[in-house]
């Protein structure tokens, strides 16, 4: 016994060292070398092998936490602060004064605080993400202890027997056992664009995707020993710079350039023109460097996104890519699967409506044949509905011997079972899409019209059709062609809409998100479902728009516009989904796409936000950006709202950061150059530390999500920041002038004068300027965070408490601090009250400035000017050219298109204009509803006339 165990271990160690070529030896030798059988491993044997071979996952590079911490100090914004620290001790050593150690220590402290917060939050976010992704860890169907079960793919070991089916990502390198050939997509590994066919005995690689078929396989390699694992060792991963990082860089560069311009002007004016002393000049440059850099920006934005990602996961949307949050906030088109997302995917069959085509057969026999062509295990919704109609699910296989089952695949769109009955005769039954089954039928030409009539009748009631066919197989083999196919019957399938779908679609349209239904069903079903859901019914078969046989009635119209204006697409194939997304993106839409199957992967990858719905295949999950853990459309709309709230916080902060940079650079530059006022750099450092501490709480601020799709508009951020910053800089300059050059405040409020009493004595004035700048700078966040009046939208409790504490500290410093090293002196409570009053008065116009900026940037102001000019012109010729255009215009209107001369979305830059598409979708839905009511009214009136009733009396009691 001991010898056998040792022999097994020696053989397995040889496999581990790759001394045996398990990819090429006959399959029998694979079992021999792996000391396993087709009955699978026992749990004990699997545990022993797991200890030997390790987990079935790639080794993760362990990053030094200390180096990661230092990495947060290695970015352009940090470099500027580090340069300021060096200036404080190297260049500031002159003018009879020692090096500026307090500023040096303060700058380093600020850097360490920001890096520590970033490090802790990213670490927490990383741990949370790892826990969430563990829920999405790939699963594998494995045979252990003689029973099939679903296990984490990470515990697979060589020798395990696994099952691979359509949509699965192959969990480990394996050799296929007996069964039908598989279609495997190896493009991610080998670059082969077309799926390859793999038969019994062939090897399949970990990471490839099953596109068709179902088969069992024996695992021959796991983890780093797989083909994928070896390739991953050879390829060094590269970090792609995302859009979010580009935005951060652009804002950082703007702030750095603003500071550089301010410093250059100061250097040119102070030294060659004003002949200022060396040391005060360096101090003034330090003020711009320290105060102007938004050093907390990367920390605030990453913390905001990490907290937001956690909130999304609580709502049932796990973000695989953090920056998908900003794209979700800007999404204006959502292409949603009908089945399972808009509907319940709980199919029911009405036996009374079954249409029988084969003589001698009743509805019960049609159901039994359909049940035979269904899987009893791993059922999809259709199989479950049909087998569930039987009195006992076992009846589906009662009295027959299964020879071969052909699983569903997207190409054939049908399943089939070859079986032997009690008398030893072989038969085959198939169920699937009516068109596919009809093509099999030997008498297609005779029954085609009736079949289509029944399908249309079902479709008008929102019912899908499922066809059933039957044939004898005299040869008795699974691969025999068999005799002529008999078209047995058509079954109606009803998939009821989700109870919340109609309300969710209405919410989406109100949020500026146009929902487009994507369905593989025929057009009539799509329109009927759309009607029930309160959508418009402006839908097209996707093949009529994108296929080879385009509809003649719309062939002359622009396909891109038709897609843009459509409420849905029917008869959709996977390649059509990709094309729809591509064309919507070409028209400047941020497009979301839901999907669940392996064939949805290309479209999910192409979409700006790929959303894998609940119960999606591994392939769909791996291609998506967001994975839903709850079914339905409402989860997506909730995620959109949350994403917009997260994005709003980030946008509010960036406007605030740019404004502060401009106000510090412009304000202190003017004070230094006009009045030769030298503000102490240490006090700017105190402002920065208090500001950064307060602003961290914006990540949990209470905000109203944008009512429209939102995105980074850098020109808007910079323009708003420059206007706000310039206004606040002027506030400081005016305050300085009134305090220093006039006796207005002492005369009005009875406070002491702040005029300097000795040469270079600006100590009390410095305290006053410090408090004025500190209060209004932090108060600006309340203006940038609100869409309406800042005093109406209540901020989050954390932000409010942080602001009060920070400004209490700032006020106490200004009132009491007598710091010789910082060159400030306490000004008393009287001046503190004056400064608070001054800031409150000048705070009020900030809201008006915000409204004016928004109005000016929207283009409305300039549109009005243009419209007034156009109003005085008139069109003289309404002749021939106009009449020629009328027919084309009528055709476009019929299909919901705008006039050809109207600017389309490609030319539009403002979100409110893009939102017109959602508004038009709402209008179409309303028109469809009114049309239905009008039809109903006409029907009622005709019945009333037929019955000879008094219509006037009825109309007084009821209105439509």
From Swiss-Prot:
Presence of the UniProt keyword Membrane in the record: yes
Organism: Arabidopsis thaliana
Active site: 337
Name assigned to this protein: ATPase 4, plasma membrane-type
Its biological purpose: The plasma membrane H(+) ATPase of plants and fungi generates a proton gradient that drives the active transport of nutrients by H(+)-symport. The resulting external acidification and/or internal alkinization may mediate growth responses.
Subcellular compartments: Cell membrane
Keyword DNA-binding: no
Any GO CC annotation of this UniProt entry: plasma membrane
Extracellular side: 90-101, 273-281, 674-678, 739-763, 818-825
GO biological process: proton export across plasma membrane; response to salt stress
Domain of life according to the entry: Eukaryota
Assembly with partners or alone: Binds to 14-3-3 proteins. The binding is induced by phosphorylation of Thr-959. Binding to 14-3-3 proteins activates the H(+)-ATPase.
Cytoplasmic-facing ranges: 1-69, 123-251, 300-651, 702-717, 785-796, 847-960
Region named Interaction with 14-3-3 proteins: 958-960
Entry-annotated residues carrying Phosphothreonine: 893, 959
Recorded family membership: Belongs to the cation transport ATPase (P-type) (TC 3.A.3) family. Type IIIA subfamily.
């Amino acid at each position: 016994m001991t010898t056998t165990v040792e022999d097994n271990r020696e053989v397995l160690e040889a496999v581990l060292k790759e001394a045996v070529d398990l990819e090429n030896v006959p399959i029998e030798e694979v079992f021999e070398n792996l000391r396993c059988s087709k009955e699978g491993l026992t749990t004990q044997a699997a545990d022993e092998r797991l200890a030997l071979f390790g987990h079935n996952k790639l080794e993760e590079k362990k990053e030094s936490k200390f180096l990661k911490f230092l990495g947060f100090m290695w970015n352009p914004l940090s470099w500027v602060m580090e340069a300021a620290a060096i200036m404080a001790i190297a260049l500031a050593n002159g003018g009879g004064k020692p090096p500026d150690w307090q500023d040096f220590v303060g700058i380093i402290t600020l850097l360490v605080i920001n890096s520590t917060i970033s490090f802790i939050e990213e670490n927490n976010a990383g741990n949370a993400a790892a826990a969430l992704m563990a829920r999405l860890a790939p699963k594998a169907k494995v045979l252990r202890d003689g029973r099939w079960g679903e296990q984490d793919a990470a515990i697979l070991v060589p020798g395990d027997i696994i099952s691979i089916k359509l949509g699965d990502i192959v969990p480990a390198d394996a050799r296929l056992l007996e069964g039908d050939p598989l279609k495997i997509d190896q493009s991610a590994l080998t670059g082969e664009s077309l799926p390859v066919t793999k038969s019994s005995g062939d090897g399949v690689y970990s990471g490839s995707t099953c596109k068709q078929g179902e088969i069992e396989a024996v695992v021959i390699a796991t983890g780093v020993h797989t083909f994928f694992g070896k390739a991953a060792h050879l390829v060094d991963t590269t970090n792609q710079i995302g859009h979010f990082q580009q935005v951060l860089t652009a804002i950082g560069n703007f702030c750095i350039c603003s500071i550089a311009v301010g410093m250059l002007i100061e250097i040119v004016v102070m030294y060659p023109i004003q002949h200022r002393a060396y040391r005060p000049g360096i101090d003034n440059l330090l003020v711009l460097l320290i105060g102007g850099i938004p050093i907390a920006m990367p920390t605030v934005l990453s913390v905001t996104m990490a907290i937001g990602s956690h909130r999304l996961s609580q709502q049932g949307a796990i973000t695989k890519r953090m920056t998908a949050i900003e794209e979700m906030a800007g999404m204006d088109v959502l292409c949603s699967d009908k089945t399972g997302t808009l509907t319940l995917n709980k199919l029911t069959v009405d036996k009374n409506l079954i249409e029988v085509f084969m003589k001698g057969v009743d509805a019960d026999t049609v159901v039994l044949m359909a049940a035979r062509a269904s899987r009893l295990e791993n059922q999809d919704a259709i199989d479950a509905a049909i087998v569930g109609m039987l009195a006992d699910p076992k009846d589906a296989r009662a009295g027959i011997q299964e020879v071969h089952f052909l699983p569903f695949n997207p190409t054939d769109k049908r399943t089939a079972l070859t079986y032997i009955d009690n008398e030893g005769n072989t038969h085959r039954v198939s169920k699937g899409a009516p068109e596919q089954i009809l093509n099999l039928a030997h008498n297609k030409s005779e029954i085609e019209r009736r079949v289509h009539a029944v399908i249309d009748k079902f479709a008008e009631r929102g019912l899908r059709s499922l066809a059933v066919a039957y044939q004898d197989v005299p040869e008795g083999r699974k691969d025999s062609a068999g005799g002529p196919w008999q078209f047995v019957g058509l079954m109606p399938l009803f998939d009821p809409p989700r109870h919340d779908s109609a309300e969710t679609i209405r919410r989406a349209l109100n949020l500026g998100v146009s929902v487009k239904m994507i369905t593989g069903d025929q057009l009539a079903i799509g329109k009927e479902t759309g009607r029930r859901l309160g959508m418009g019914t402006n839908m097209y078969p996707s093949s009529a728009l994108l296929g080879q046989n385009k509809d003649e009635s719309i062939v002359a119209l622009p396909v891109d516009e038709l897609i843009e204006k459509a409420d849905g697409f029917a008869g959709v194939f996977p390649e059509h989904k990709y094309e729809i997304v591509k064309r919507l993106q070409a028209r400047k839409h941020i497009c979301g796409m839901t999907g669940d199957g392996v064939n949805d992967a290309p479209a999910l990858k192409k979409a700006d936000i790929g959303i894998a719905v609940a119960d999606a295949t591994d392939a769909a999950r791996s291609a998506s950006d967001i994975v839903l853990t709850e079914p339905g459309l409402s989860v997506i709309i909730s995620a959109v709202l949350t994403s917009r709230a997260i994005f709003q916080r980030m946008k509010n902060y960036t406007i605030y950061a740019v404004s502060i940079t401009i106000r510090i650079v412009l304000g202190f530059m003017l004070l230094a150059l006009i009045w030769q006022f030298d503000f102490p750099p240490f006090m700017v450092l105190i402002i920065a530390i208090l500001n950064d501490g307060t602003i961290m709480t914006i990540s949990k601020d209470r905000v109203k999500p944008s009512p429209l799709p939102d995105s980074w508009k850098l020109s808007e951020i910079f323009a708003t920041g420059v206007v706000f910053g310039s206004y606040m800089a002027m506030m400081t300059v005016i305050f300085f002038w009134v305090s220093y050059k006039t006796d207005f405040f002492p005369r009005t409020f009875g406070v002491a004068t702040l005029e300097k009493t000795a040469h270079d004595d600006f100590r009390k004035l410095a305290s006053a300027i410090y408090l004025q700048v500190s209060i209004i700078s932090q108060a600006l966040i309340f203006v940038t965070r609100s869409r309406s009046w800042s005093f109406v939208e209540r901020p989050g409790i954390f932000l409010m408490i942080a602001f009060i504490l920070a400004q209490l500290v700032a006020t106490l410093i200004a009132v009491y601090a007598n710091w010789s090293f910082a060159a400030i002196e306490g000004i008393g409570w009287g001046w503190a009250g004056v400064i608070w009053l001054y800031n409150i008065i000048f705070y009020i116009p900030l809201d008006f400035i915000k409204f004016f900026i928004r109005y000016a940037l929207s283009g409305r102001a300039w549109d009005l000017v243009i419209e007034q000019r156009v109003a005085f012109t008139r069109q003289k010729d309404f002749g021939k050219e106009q009449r020629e255009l009328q027919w084309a215009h009528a055709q476009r209107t019929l299909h919901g298109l705008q006039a050809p001369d109207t600017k389309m979305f490609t030319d539009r830059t403002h979100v409110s204009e893009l939102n017109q598409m959602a508004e038009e979708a709402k209008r179409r839905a309303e028109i469809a509803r009114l049309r239905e009511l009008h039809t109903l009214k006409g029907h009622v009136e005709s019945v009333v006339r037929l019955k000879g009733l008094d219509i006037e009396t009825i109309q007084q009691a009821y209105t439509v």
